[in-house]
């Protein structure tokens, strides 16, 4: 089946995805942005130095600032931040082809409702199947053609495999899944845990503490995913463990850098500057966990630190003096 692919969102991740799919050469790809001036520059210069400095964009990649440019696309990737996806669905929904599959590429939870992004998009776009792409992949690595593997999940395996085949390339490999819950929650919760890893680094309390956070954070993630109807095996895969290791250790991670700033005692506003998905997801995840009676002490601590309800020193003491239990 011949596919036509549209990527909405001309930030770093959307541009990188559009570029790597275009380089694969199997499907025509168009990158759709909201800023006509930026789109004109991308088309003329084949560079996006503001977010991907020095990386040339393929000549085969098309560009547009018009919403109707997605008409005719059989696969449409939503690559804007999580909290902007509902508005994007309303803006671009009228131009979707009848049989188009929508793929959310954000890693977050809808802040006002606590819904997963696939649930929100199905509510906004009820006539279209919705999938999710997530996992350990930085935009710069993808755009540079460095080997990257991620997960793509749909409601059925047939659709997931079709999407994986259409989007994968020589340096960008997707693994198909039918666990949309697990893939999405892994992507959202690892951002919160990456902030915790950053706090550890900024505070200077050692790599042993970071390793403990990753391991115990993964246990929290697994409890939450299973309680929400996802699969524990997904948590141990690319969208869970893989993404957590990447964002909890690499300074390319906005969430890690945000945590480092907190750990150093710097004032860091998650709503200013670089968008930090984990800062937005922490309170939502903590609230949902409490409603489900799930123990998530690391997530709770991160939420309380960001909200100013808990000092870092007190959070560390609370975590280290919890009742002894089995692993």
Swiss-Prot record:
Chief location of this protein within or outside the cell: cytoplasm
GO MF terms, alphabetically ordered: glycerol-3-phosphate dehydrogenase [NAD(P)+] activity; NAD binding
Coiled-coil parts of chain: none
Physiological role: Catalyzes the reduction of the glycolytic intermediate dihydroxyacetone phosphate (DHAP) to sn-glycerol 3-phosphate (G3P), the key precursor for phospholipid synthesis.
Pathway as given in its UniProt record: Membrane lipid metabolism; glycerophospholipid metabolism
GO terms of biological process kind: carbohydrate metabolic process; glycerol-3-phosphate biosynthetic process; glycerol-3-phosphate catabolic process; glycerophospholipid metabolic process; phospholipid biosynthetic process
Reactions catalysed: sn-glycerol 3-phosphate + NAD(+) = dihydroxyacetone phosphate + NADH + H(+); sn-glycerol 3-phosphate + NADP(+) = dihydroxyacetone phosphate + NADPH + H(+)
Recorded family membership: Belongs to the NAD-dependent glycerol-3-phosphate dehydrogenase family.
Gene3D superfamilies per the UniProt record, alphabetical: N-(1-d-carboxylethyl)-l-norvaline Dehydrogenase, domain 2 (1.10.1040.10), NAD(P)-binding Rossmann-like Domain (3.40.50.720)
Name under which the protein is recorded: Glycerol-3-phosphate dehydrogenase [NAD(P)+]
Top-level taxon: Bacteria
Cellular component annotations (GO), alphabetically ordered: cytosol
Protein residues bound to sn-glycerol 3-phosphate: 107, 135, 190, 243, 253-255
Stored PANTHER family: GLYCEROL-3-PHOSPHATE DEHYDROGENASE, GLYCEROL-3-PHOSPHATE DEHYDROGENASE [NAD(+)] 2, CHLOROPLASTIC
InterPro entries recorded: 6-PGluconate_DH-like_C_sf, 6PGD_dom2, G3P_DH_NAD-dep, G3P_DH_NAD-dep_C, G3P_DH_NAD-dep_N, NAD(P)-bd_dom_sf
Residues annotated as the enzyme's active site: 190 (proton acceptor)
Enzyme class: oxidoreductase
UniProt EC number: 1.1.1.94
């Amino acid at each position: 089946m011949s596919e036509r692919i549209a990527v909405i969102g001309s930030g770093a991740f959307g541009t990188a995805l559009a570029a790597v799919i275009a380089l694969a050469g199997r499907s025509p790809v168009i990158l759709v942005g909201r800023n006509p001036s930026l789109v004109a520059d991308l088309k003329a210069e084949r560079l996006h130095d503001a977010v991907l400095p020095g990386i040339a964009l393929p000549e085969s990649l098309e560009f547009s600032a018009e919403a109707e440019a997605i008409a005719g696309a059989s696969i449409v990737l939503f690559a804007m931040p999580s909290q902007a996806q509902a508005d994007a669905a309303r803006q671009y929904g009228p131009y979707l082809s009848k049989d188009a599959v929508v793929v959310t590429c954000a890693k977050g939870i809808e802040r006002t409702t606590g819904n997963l992004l696939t649930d929100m998009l199905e509510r906004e776009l009820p006539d279209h199947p919705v999938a999710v792409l997530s996992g350990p992949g930085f935009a710069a690595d993808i755009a540079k053609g460095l080997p990257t593997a991620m997960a793509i999940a749909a409601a059925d395996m047939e659709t997931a495999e079709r999407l994986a085949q259409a989007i994968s390339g020589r340096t960008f490999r997707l693994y198909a899944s039918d666990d949309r819950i697990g893939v999405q929650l892994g992507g959202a919760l690892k951002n919160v845990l990456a902030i915790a890893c950053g706090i550890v680094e900024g505070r200077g309390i050692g790599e042993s503490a970071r390793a403990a956070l990753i391991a115990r954070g993964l246990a929290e993630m697994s409890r939450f995913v299973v309680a929400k109807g996802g699969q524990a095996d997904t948590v141990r895969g690319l969208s869970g463990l893989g993404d957590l290791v990447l964002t909890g250790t690499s300074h390319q991670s906005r969430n890690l850098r945000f945590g480092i700033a907190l750990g150093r005692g710097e004032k860091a506003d998650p709503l200013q500057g670089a968008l930090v998905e984990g800062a937005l997801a922490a309170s939502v995840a903590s609230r949902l966990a409490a409603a489900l009676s799930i123990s998530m002490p690391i997530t709770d601590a991160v939420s309380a630190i960001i909200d100013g309800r808990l000092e870092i020193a007190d959070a560390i003491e609370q975590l280290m003096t919890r009742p002894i239990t089995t692993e």
